Amino acid sequence: GASITASNTVTFTVDRFNSYGSAAAKYTVQQNAGSVTPPVGFTNYLGCTSSSAYSVGASDFFAVSQNIEGVNTADLSWGTASAKTVTLSFQAYSSLTGTFGGVIYNALFNRSFPFTYTISSANTWTSISIPIAGDTSGTWAGYAVGLTLSFSLGAGASVSGTAGAWVGAAALRAGLRGWSNACSLPRILRFAGAAPTILSRASKRLLTCLC
């Protein structure tokens, strides 16, 4: 597909994912960006490519995200004492090594779970698996957006937070830093097969990224 330039408004891109940047035109999103071989079991992937050098400010954030409908998340029972644990699994491929991040948050932007993952080898697909304890607080059910999964491509200090725990802060919807504090060429981050899975029923996936 064609390359889509991220703007400072939500722009739909590949396979239900959307892009956003607090500063426009700092990265592009494209199916099969860079034309690398997809991971085993996939024919395509979502690729994000840095477009220009940029120093990320304290309140800046850049991300690709997917909204998951409430009808697909209601049986997680999040927001109750019976909240179920899920595992977020995906394949990641980067021109850089290091720690990357993202976040899961609710439709009201007041419950967030920042997470990190590590890519130790550049330019190779890495399998990522992140357990996420169900949130016993907040509002999660509904027929519109149930939750949002967001992969950070860069985030400043005021919109970042400590990974691995639920927080009641809208500011953390940007997640962790992603591409560190400066976007510069050439930096490419690719994803395939992003899917939260309920641990107690591993066959159920809340979303599937076919990109």
Enumerate the language-model features and the residues they cover:
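Extracellular and organelle-lumenal recognition/adhesion modules and their flexible linkers in secreted
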Residues: 1-211
